[in-house]
């Protein structure tokens, strides 16, 4: 295990390992990708390669909605902060989305067409198995 006096640094150094301890707090995530929309993502551990389990974080800024899409793998999602809104179908219909506050758990099957967004800044944690891709309808 990496030795560091800073627990966040030590955790980040172990992020891709599946054999070393790792911890992350919502306010101290080492975001690896950011989009102009304000969304951000990070892979905590594992890889998105075929047959590999990985954990990730995804941040959705207040007011953002992602158009209908599906993923190649099932996602097990935990709402860490804020409130995730999600609906199913090929049309973006925010009024049809259900709300899931922090502490909620969701299972989204592979291939399920859905749209998601947030009215408040929201961070989710997820667990899935690769290969991972997002396909927009």
Write out the residue ranges for each language-model feature.
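A short, N-terminal "cap"/entry segment at the start of jelly-roll beta-barrel domains
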Residues: 3-54, 97
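Double-stranded beta-helix
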Residues: 19-22, 95, 115-137
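Membrane-topology and secretion signals of cell-surface/extracellular proteins
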Residues: 35-39, 66, 113-116, 135
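Short acidic-glycine-tyrosine-enriched beta hairpin
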Residues: 47-49, 84, 90-111
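A structural connector/turn signal
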Residues: 55, 65-67, 74, 95, ...
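Glycine- and acidic-residue-biased ligand/ion/polar-headgroup-sensing regions
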Residues: 61-64, 71-91
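Short beta-strand His + acidic residue motifs that chelate non-heme Fe in jelly-roll/DSBH
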Residues: 66-68, 86-87, 108, 113-119
